[in-house]
Amino acid sequence: MAESWDHSSDAASDTGSNWQWLFFLAALLTFLVPFVGGYIWFARQISYQEVSEIKKAEAIIVLTGGADRVADGLKVLSEGHAERLLISGVSAGTNASDMTKNFPQYRDVIECCVELGYKAQNTVGNAEEALAFTKRHGLHKALIIVTSNYHMPRTLLETKASLGSIELIPYPVIPERLKGRFWWNSLDMSRLIFVEYIKFGLAYMRLLARAPAKH
């Protein structure tokens, strides 16, 4: 007796499997294309050049995280680009005397025009300290924001959400170890920017969810 073979069920199974793979790949590409595109956009927002000119503002906000940031902020203050400066996120126990020891060339401006903020533990806290600082001194026009170049986009996002209509003038600081490195030719820089890109995205979604609905 001849045995009959029916391949129709196998063919249907293969077709279903192929569609599943196509659906998976389509879903993956739908996620990856905007994600990678967003990363490239974010990386291009970061400045890799030292600031040559800067507008005058009412005050300067320096976010701690490196001596370069503080030094550059004090330099901008001493050049007369603002009347006062807040260093946000200072560790407990640090005071003005420590500042003058570390930056003796800026003793005069430290003694007259620098405030230290101790409450901030992160970028959100920096924005909150900046808001309290502006209210305390009646500032409402423009601030110079000093932080590392890779940290600037998220800093501006959080600070703008906190301060509202006050103009924010970025003063990106390029850390010494990262000078001459770009996201397209340095694995370390690419990783650093990738982590910051994720943090920026999470901050953006949090602020978007918190925003009041428009009717």
Q: Model-flagged regions — what are they?
A:
Residues 1-19:
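N-terminal Lys/Arg-rich, disordered targeting/topogenic segments
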Residues 4, 214-215:
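Amphipathic, soluble alpha/beta structural segments
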Residues 4, 18-20, 40, 182-183:
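Residues in intrinsically disordered, low-complexity segments of regulatory proteins
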Residues 40-187:
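A structural signal for short, hydrophobic/glycine-enriched beta-strand patches
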